[in-house]
């Protein structure tokens, strides 16, 4: 992209970045005229981060600690954070994924007070044996609900087939047995390792300014220098072979769910370009504009939920195709045949351009929404990129790039 166009794009995106003395990355997109503000406080700590070394001490966590910690952050000696948010009128939530935990809220009033709730609860954790025991029962019920979800069981089943050792095999919430092992010491160790400001991102978009967000950081000690020691994640060797060729689960469903997974070589950290390229390739193969999707859908073999996705975390990269069908074996064979055809012939240039424009448009459209803006900023910042850099990178991807990548992924031996 020409330099003048890049400068114009950065002005249009209008993200303001600061790295505080504590190491915290702060990104703000002021959106004058908007009535609400969306704020996300995110850490690079997810369900796969179970084995690590910090200050010479090795820590090995049972499955589900990151998700458990997310729940416990909302409770301290002063009561429940949701009750405090209710007083400010903010709508708050949180979630844990494989590689991150995010705390968020949307506010139309009393933004300073809501920021104090968010920053206060995340920077001042409080755990006891009694509060942990109470939460173990609550999350245990949540785990049982996930066990009854065919869609979630399908995804975890795919991971169990693809991976021998990688912790992505384990459910994000853990099991009833694994969370029973959680102690206050484990939670405090996790906070020290992963909730250090240098491992976190604070993003805000809407009716706010960088000055307002920095003032909140000042109130909660996030402007002070902190130790720069980084946690060292520990991984078991993962072979490129499959753990299992297939798996079948019997559950009460109206239509069978199916999944086809490909185990790929792990990508380098923060390689968003290759991830975006893989995503475009999947759109060309199974997206709504692809010939395969039309044949499957028009033939009644799949419903609109059929499609593919890329999952990339540390030590793991896989491509998953999922959907519902009364003839899953036929769909799988048609999928494999289409992949072989496109690998030999190359991606359709017109479809590639349409898919690329669609992705590009989604990134631009997100700039007009406070929730999507903050989420987009936090998501890319956790991988070391700005939104403008991501847009520029996407614009530079070509069909020739896709053809070259296809020679190294989606191999039948890895399915």
Predicted regions and their residues:
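His/Glu-rich zincin catalytic helix
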Residues: 1-81, 188-295, 413-414
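C-terminal regions of mature proteins
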Residues: 7, 201-206, 342, 353-413
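Second-shell loop/turn segments in exported
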Residues: 55, 70-72, 102-106, 126, ...
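Acidic/histidine-enriched segments that form metal/cofactor-coordinating
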Residues: 77-190, 303, 334-337, 347-375
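Short, conserved charged micro-motifs
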Residues: 111-114, 209-214, 269-271, 328-333
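Flexible, glycine/charged-enriched surface loops at secondary-structure junctions
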Residues: 229-235, 303-309, 345-355
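A structural supersecondary motif
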Residues: 259-266, 283-325
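Extended amphipathic alpha-helical segments enriched in small hydrophobics
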Residues: 319-348
């Amino acid at each position: 992209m020409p330099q003048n166009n890049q400068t114009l794009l950065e002005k249009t995106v209008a993200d303001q970045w600061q790295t505080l003395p504590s190491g915290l990355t702060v990104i703000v997109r002021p959106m004058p005229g908007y009535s609400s503000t969306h704020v996300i406080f995110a850490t690079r700590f997810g369900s796969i981060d179970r084995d690590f070394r910090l200050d010479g001490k090795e820590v090995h966590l049972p499955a589900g600690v990151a998700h458990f910690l997310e729940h416990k952050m909302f409770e301290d000696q002063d009561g429940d954070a949701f009750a405090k948010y209710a007083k400010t009128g903010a709508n708050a939530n949180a979630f844990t994924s494989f590689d991150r935990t995010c705390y968020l809220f949307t506010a139309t009033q009393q933004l300073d007070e809501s920021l104090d709730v968010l920053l206060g609860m995340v920077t001042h954790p409080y755990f006891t044996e009694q509060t942990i025991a109470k939460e173990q029962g609550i999350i245990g019920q949540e785990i049982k609900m996930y066990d009854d979800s065919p869609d979630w069981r399908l995804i975890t089943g795919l991971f169990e087939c693809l991976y021998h050792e990688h912790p992505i095999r384990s459910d994000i919430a853990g099991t009833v047995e694994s969370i029973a092992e959680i102690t206050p010491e484990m939670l405090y160790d996790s906070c020290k390792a992963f909730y250090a400001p240098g491992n976190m991102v604070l993003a805000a978009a809407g009716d706010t300014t960088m000055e307002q967000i920095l003032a909140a950081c000042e109130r909660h000690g996030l402007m002070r220098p902190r130790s720069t020691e980084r946690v060292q994640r520990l991984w078991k060797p993962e072979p490129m072979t499959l753990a299992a060729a297939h798996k079948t689960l019997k559950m009460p469903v109206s239509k069978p769910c199916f999944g086809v997974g490909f185990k790929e070589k792990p990508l380098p950290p923060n390689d968003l370009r290759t991830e975006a390229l893989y995503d475009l390739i999947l759109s060309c193969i199974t997206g709504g504009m692809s010939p395969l999707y039309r044949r499957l859908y028009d033939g009644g073999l799949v419903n609109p939920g059929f499609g593919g996705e890329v999952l990339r975390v540390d030590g793991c990269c896989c491509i998953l195709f999922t959907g519902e069908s009364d003839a899953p074996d036929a769909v799988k064979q048609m999928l494999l045949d289409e992949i072989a055809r496109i690998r030999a012939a190359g991606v359709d240039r017109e479809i590639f351009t349409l898919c690329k424009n669609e992705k590009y448009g989604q990134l631009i459209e997100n700039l007009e929404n406070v929730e999507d803006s903050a989420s987009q900023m936090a998501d890319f910042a956790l991988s070391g990129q700005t939104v403008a850099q991501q847009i520029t990178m996407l614009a530079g991807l070509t069909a020739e790039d896709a053809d070259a990548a296809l020679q190294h992924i989606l191999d039948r031996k890895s399915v």
